[in-house]
Amino acid sequence: GLLDALSGILGL
């Protein structure tokens, strides 16, 4: 989802 994309970029 959205968090998956953000987390993927931030490395979280």
From Swiss-Prot:
Localization (cell): Secreted
Any GO BP annotation: innate immune response
UniProt keyword annotations, A-Z: Amidation, Amphibian defense peptide, Antibiotic, Antimicrobial, Immunity, Innate immunity, Secreted
Residue(s) carrying Leucine amide: 12
One GO CC term on file: extracellular region
Tissue expression summary: Expressed by the skin glands.
Family: Belongs to the frog skin active peptide (FSAP) family. Frenatin subfamily.
Task of the protein: Antimicrobial peptide with selective activity. Is only active against Micrococcus luteus (MIC=25 ug/ml) and not against Bacillus cereus, Escherichia coli, Leuconostoc mesenteroides, Micrococcus luteus, Pastewella haemolytica, Staphylococcus aureus, Streptococcus faecalis and Streptococcus uberis.
Identification of the protein by name: Frenatin-1
Taxonomic placement: Eukaryota, Metazoa, Chordata, Craniata, Vertebrata
